[in-house]
Structure formats: C-alpha cells, structure tokens
C-alpha cells in the first residue's frame, strides 16, 4: 500500500473517523472524554520526550562499514580483525559535550566520537572524543565537570568563569584546555576531525599475551576548523551546521571515511614508562609508540528516523569483545559503571532490544536467558518458557571457558592514593604542544583564554 492510500488509525489499529474536529457536547460545547483519539494523541505527546543525555546531548549519527586493511592478529584474536578485507557493520554518533539537545553545533567544545561495531562476538562500543586526552584522570571529578560546563544554578546561563574556576584548580587539565583553546577547538564539521579512543585499552592474542593500546581514527577528509568569528557567523544563520553537513554529504554519496590506527605498548614497556601509561591527561609520543594501521570505516547510510537511531543509540564501555580488554585507567574504570547505568535510566533496562542497539552479529535468540522481564521486553518473547536459572540439568547456556581473558595485572592495596604524589608532570606535554603551534596559533590560544576569562 502506498503512503497516499494509507488510512488513519489510532495506535491500536482503530479507524479514526475525524482528524480535525473534536467530539463535543453540541457544536460549541465542551469536549467529551470519550473522544478516544484526542486522548490517545495528547497522552502520547505528553510522554514522548525521554530524558536527555547528561553529557553529549546534541548528536548526529549514521550507519557504516568497518573494513580491515592490515593484519594485527599478533596483538589480538578479536574476530573483527581476523583477516584483511573483513567488513563489519557499524554505527557512529558524533556530538558536542556540554550543550543541550538544541545547542549550536559550531560551539567551542569537545566533540564526542562514539562507535558501535556489530561483530559476531557481540557489540563493541568505543566511546571516544575528538581529543586524545581529558581534563582529569580520576572519575570522582566527573560530576563537577558537568556542573562547571553546564548552566549555573542561579542564572541558568552557561558561565565561562565557572569553567575556568574548575579547570585552574586542576593542573592536569592544562593539556586538554590547550587543545580546546587551540585552532582545533572548533571543528568545521564532523567529517573534518580526528577521533580517539583516548583511554588506554588492552589487546590479547591466542597465546594470552597482553599489550596495552591506544586507538586513533584519522579523518581522510583532512582537518578543517573554524575561528571564533567564523563559528559565530555560522551559529547566527543555523544551529545544526555539522548535522546538516554530515547528513547531506551521505545523501549525495560523498561518504566520509576514517583510518583506524593503534599504538602498542608491552607490559614491560609500561612498567618502565616515564609517566603513568594509564593517565588520561597524557598521550604516548608517536616516535616512541608509532601508529600502526588497522583498517578504515566509512559512513554510508543515514538513519530513516533520527529518534529511533541517533537519540536511542546507547553506548557503554562495558560492551567489549573477546581479544580486547580494559586497563587500570581510572577514568575508564569509572565509565564502566556510569555509561550503562545512565542508559538504563534514560532508555530502560531493555534498551539493548532497540534495533540500533541489538547485537546483530550474534542474533537476538542467543542472548543471555537469565536477564528477564522489565519494561518494554518485546522482541524475544521474553525467552519464552526456556530455562532461566543456572546450574540446570538441561545442558543449556553453559559457560564458554575458551573465552577466558588472560590475568589482569594489578598491584598494591586498596587505598585512596594521592594522584598528585604519584605524578606531578603536568606541563611537559601541553608545553610541547604549545611550542609546536605557529606564532599565529599561539596568539589565538592566548586571546581566546583572555576573552573567555573576561566573559
């Protein structure tokens, strides 16, 4: 049936006899409560807005394909990387961080760079940014960052002095602040920026050998940025500049691509590394740990419905596949709890059943039978009458010991260790970054800092 031939019904399929005129007591009388279509429409409308993401609320996304171009099987046995030429479906969501859903795309802000790969071993979520570092290295400060960069409780306005008051209390923030205030602080759009996993992760191979890795995604479109003046001009004419650019590029077949690289550090190198290799405020120098090409991803299909896919997509650092693992990075460890918890609040405990979040490479029928019930359990018959406990005598859903990860190295006693006593090398890397800038770029960094502090 064509769109023109469709007839209007309510959500339960009842024919709607009149779309324009409410049922009233007489032609000028009050409404009758038995106008079921009016009641249905208004009650649906009153509830259709779901909670906004606490960070990364304004986003754009697209489906695509990841392709392996180089062999890294000596580092990892993850099947997504098992052979050159292998392709995996994926979804990407890019975002600003501090702004709300209606924020302008061209604001000075970090950009979120979140990727979901639908592998045959489950979904792999890489929740990154367009910068390789962050403002701090302990997750206890994350709530305060949210408060500082969002709206002031008294004025309900965003306040640059709150930002600077917070940042200047954290000497380790200088690296991220330098990047944010540099020419790369405002990407021209989402296609012309790099992405980073930022955290240190680990990979392990068939022999159980573990290496630490950082992940990089370099745009094949080249880096393009905006000055403050250019950004202000764009915002004055349209707040959705990056979203429009990405959508229109994909619609006309100009598919954006990024090349994936890893940096690799052995466990022995990590023990002897000058700084804490798991410190999110620092990078690994490329001359010491060179970039190793892995593959590329291409975004080639726009969602048919923004809410269905871009708004409801749920990323969590806990979504990781065999062959990949975590690290002692404290910020990563904090995100292992926070992201999944936030998605369960925002979308419900069964948000994994939303199509964009389903583990397409595994099959919905093979999902854990011990997670049952909950609001909106709809797509898998709630596992029917199958066994929902373990151990059982039916031989169903046994563990898979072949997927056990190699032992995770730790040291020390549980204690609130003073991070500043462990590492106070705050200025070496931001200093090197600043000195790499052109004289004009250095001047712009200082001008932006002065302007924002006076704001």
Curated annotation (Swiss-Prot):
GO MF term list: catalase activity; heme binding
Cystine residue pairs: none
One GO process term, biological-process aspect: response to hydrogen peroxide
Domain of life: Bacteria
Its job: Catalytically inactive.
Segments for region (Disordered): 1-25
Entry similarity comment: Belongs to the catalase family.
Pfam families recorded: Catalase (PF00199)
GO CC annotation terms, alphabetical: cytoplasm
Record's protein name: Catalase-like protein
């Amino acid at each position: 049936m064509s769109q023109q031939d469709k007839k209007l019904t309510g959500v339960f399929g009842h024919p709607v006899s009149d779309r324009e005129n409410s049922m009233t007591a007489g032609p000028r009388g009050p409404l009758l409560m038995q106008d079921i279509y009016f009641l249905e429409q208004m009650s649906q409308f009153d509830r259709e807005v779901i909670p906004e993401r606490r960070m990364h609320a304004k986003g754009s996304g697209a489906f695509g394909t990841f392709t392996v171009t180089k062999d890294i099987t000596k580092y990892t046995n993850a099947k997504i990387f098992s052979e050159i030429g292998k392709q995996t479906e994926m979804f990407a969501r890019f975002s600003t961080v501090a702004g709300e859903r209606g924020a302008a795309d061209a604001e000075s802000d970090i950009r979120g760079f979140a990727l979901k790969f639908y592998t045959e071993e489950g979904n792999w979520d890489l929740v990154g940014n367009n910068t390789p570092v962050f403002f701090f290295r302990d997750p206890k400060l994350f709530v305060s960052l949210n408060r500082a960069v969002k709206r002031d409780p008294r004025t309900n306005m965003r306040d640059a002095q709150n930002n600077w008051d917070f940042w200047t209390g954290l000497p380790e923030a200088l690296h991220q602040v330098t990047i944010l205030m540099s020419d790369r602080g405002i990407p021209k759009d989402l296609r012309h920026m790099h992405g980073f996993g930022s955290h240190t992760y680990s990979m392990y191979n068939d022999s159980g050998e573990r290496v630490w890795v950082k992940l990089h995604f370099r745009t094949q479109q080249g880096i393009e940025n905006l000055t403050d003046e250019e950004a202000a001009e764009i915002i004055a004419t349209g707040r959705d500049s990056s979203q429009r650019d990405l959508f229109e590029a994909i619609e006309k077949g100009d598919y954006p691509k990024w090349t994936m690289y890893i940096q690799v550090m052995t466990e022995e190198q990590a023990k002897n590394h000058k700084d804490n290799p798991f410190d999110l405020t620092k990078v690994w120098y490329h001359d010491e740990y060179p970039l190793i090409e892995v593959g590329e991803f291409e975004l080639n299909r726009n969602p048919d419905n923004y809410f269905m896919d871009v708004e409801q997509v749920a990323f969590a650092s806990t979504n990781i596949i065999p062959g990949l693992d975590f690290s002692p990075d404290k910020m990563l460890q904090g995100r292992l709890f926070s992201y999944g918890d936030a998605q369960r609040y925002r979308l419900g405990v069964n948000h994994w059943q939303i199509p964009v979040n389903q583990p397409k490479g595994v099959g919905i029928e093979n999902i854990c039978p011990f997670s049952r019930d909950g609001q909106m359990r709809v797509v898998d018959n709630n596992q029917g009458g199958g066994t929902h406990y373990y151990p059982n005598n039916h031989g169903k859903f046994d563990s898979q010991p072949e997927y056990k990860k190699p032992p995770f190295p730790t040291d020390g006693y549980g204690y609130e260790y003073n991070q500043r006593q462990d590492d106070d090398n705050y200025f070496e890397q931001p200093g090197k970054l600043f000195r790499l800038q052109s004289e004009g770029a250095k001047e712009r960094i200082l001008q932006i800092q002065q302007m924002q502090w006076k704001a």
